[in-house]
């Protein structure tokens, strides 16, 4: 395919000159029709099986004098990239996307050589694993090698401090070897059955295609590939949280068509993407669309036209790319990275390709997709075709020698495991040993007085003013501290010591029971002031959307990335565990044992028989306890404000980083018998 087939009209200024000559309404209408609907007529399916839909608007005006303009637009918008951007309403963004589609240059020097090498190396690696390990599940990328070019180009162009990758099964092993820098010998050892962690650690570990990796590529770019469970998309919010806690990170999410369309956590994460507390500067989503999920055809897998239609809700542009056009992959990657740099928001690239081997190496795809598989069998190898087209000869000698040595090596424990004190035999005893969390009483009084001070010039609600007055009375020794005061003291004291605090939850800033008031509102102009500002380290205090699964995953990921920070998330009621159970099971309670991921996340589940019905009143203590094993979790039910103060501070000052689930009270928040003198929060 000629380079000019997807670079404007072969001339970056061609369309501008055509429009400059004819600027009437009919010309503009034709251009707008192609910009909005042309992607449905683009040649993005290499098999030619997906139906193409030519919108009537593209041919509504058949005036002969519009012919040159129509031809130019068809070359731009009906080529190997489908520009699905009509749902983007911001005028500046629309103009930017139109310019990106209608102008541009060919691949930069060296890009085609790199692409040709990647295609050839991927084909060799996939062939070697099939020949040498015929029963190993690698979820081959055979038939979708263009995805390697796409992902590699994104990482290279972004050149971020670290690419944080939430991945997928498809092509996982090849990506580790060729994109992410995992040592080949270690990969093959894991495929042969060697544990990825020393047995002396006592860790459960996982199958090879679930494992993560953190290292440096040959070009010096750092990558962090998150481990994931078979519930694939649940890793995406975890990766996003880690990206937020990693300065200069690039969040890169890899999806397959069935997963991004079918798993609701993807929509949840996109709903978070434009909210300031969850901002990561834009996530680049790469979707591998094989038009089949395991054995399920696309027609049975989703109602939407495309797999990534969830992105339309947040007006993220969606570029559809022909998986057999590496030059189109390079261009789409450049557009995605530049979009993120310009607008700091999400963008989606959908690469349409196919699976030569079915779902995995022991699958028989002809049982369910015989027509598709016949078309696949007729396709030539992309690597050889691309190299021949551009007269390139990739040198694979060093790669093949390394690969051959790795496959011949005897399986051995490939990892020294590093430091894992949370899995040591004495972990439970260390968790039960109370750290020093108390503070001098005069220090507590000073902090509490600041927490009770009325912000200058703020017209308070009368009940909020009384709330602060009670705080000042506690600071003066006229009354013991209630639950909310002890909690605020824990936060303020950590901030003063230099530990950042991130407290969030569903209606939690005020408190679902009006007990907290961490942010005060001016009754006249609505101005808001956080009572935790100015104590030292950064305090984040905010309400979260009515989203449990993605929010918990994000908060967990952030706690993994930043061990200095106290991360606390509160559900509105404890039974909301029902909705976040997947990320709780897979990561919060199982992340350390499987993947050595440590976290001090604190999860608050309001719990108690207070007239809410049998389910709405419970945090399901039995389910949480069922997930406890090998000292993986703190489960607490504090009975006094002082208990709660020490528990929160212990999450920062304790000897081991462990998640804590707190079954927090409702009736006790204002119970006259549930008060603590400041002396109970003292040292010793």
Locate each region found by the language model.
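Extended, charge-enriched "interface" segments that sit outside catalytic cores
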Residues: 2-148
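Hard-cation-handling environments
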Residues: 393-501
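Active-site cores of enzymes that catalyze phosphoryl transfer or operate on phosphate-rich substrates
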Residues: 104-126, 188-240, 244, 638, ...
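Cofactor-binding active-site loop characterized by glycine-rich and histidine/acidic residues
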Residues: 161-164, 168-315, 319, 513-562
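Glycine-rich ThDP/TPP pyrophosphate-binding loop and its adjacent helix/strand module
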Residues: 150, 226-412, 575, 610-612, ...
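Conserved phosphate/anionic-ligand binding catalytic regions in large, soluble enzymes, centered on
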Residues: 31-46, 149, 153-179, 236, ...
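Conserved pre-catalytic core of RNA-dependent polymerases
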Residues: 88-148, 152-207, 509, 516, ...
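ASCE RecA-like P-loop NTPase motor cores
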Residues: 495, 509, 527-684
